Structures are given as C-alpha cells and as structure tokens.
Amino acid sequence: MYALVEINGKQYKAVEGEFLKIDKISPIEKEKLEFNSVLLINKDGEIKIGKPYVINSSIKCTYKEDKKDKKVVSYRYRRRKSSERKVGHRQTYSYILVDEIVF
C-alpha cells in the first residue's frame, strides 16, 4: 500500500513503514506529523485518485532527524579574464517515518 502526498509544494511517494526524505521542516512542525493533501492511494491494486485531493484521507508520520546531503559544487570559469568562481552548497533534509495511511 502506498500513497502520493504533497508536502511543501512537492510530491512524494509514501509507503507505510518506510522513511521519506523531504525538504527541511520548521521546528514547530516536528514530533507527530499529519499530512492531509493526499493525491492518490493504491491499496492492493485498488486505486483512489483525488480531484485534486482524496477526501477524508491523511498520512501520519513521525519525525526522526535532519541530515545534510552531499555537497554540490558550482564552478564558473571565464577564459582569458583571470576570473573564476567556485561555490559549494549542502541542502538540509528531514527524514520522517510513515506510520499509517488513513483513508
């Protein structure tokens, strides 16, 4: 059983008992989480599609931790100008455990 859920404007596939890697959430929202914007639910081949969301459905999750992803390096070099720029970025993600899909 899985569901497609919209969290902070992005869509994720949520499976019961598995972790979701989402963009960092604010400290106020941590602890027990519940997301009501479920787009699709698939249970044993029976598919429910929302218009745009499935009515009376939600996903209950538990916050686990924040982690940083691998560093992404952006490098720009201008030939014959003696100019170059190197910038690194590490995105922070929150890991949440999907406890239950309710519908």
Swiss-Prot record:
GO terms for biological process: translation. Coiled coil: none annotated. One of its GO terms (cellular component) is ribonucleoprotein complex. InterPro entries: bL21-like, bL21-like_sf, Ribosomal_bL21, Ribosomal_bL21_CS. The keyword Metal-binding does not apply. One of its GO terms (molecular function) is rRNA binding. Keywords: Ribonucleoprotein, Ribosomal protein, RNA-binding, rRNA-binding. This protein binds to 23S rRNA in the presence of protein L20. PANTHER family: 50S RIBOSOMAL PROTEIN L21, LARGE RIBOSOMAL SUBUNIT PROTEIN BL21M. Belongs to the bacterial ribosomal protein bL21 family. Part of the 50S ribosomal subunit. Contacts protein L20. This is Large ribosomal subunit protein bL21. It comes from Borreliella afzelii (strain PKo). The lineage of its organism: Bacteria, Pseudomonadati, Spirochaetota, Spirochaetia, Spirochaetales.
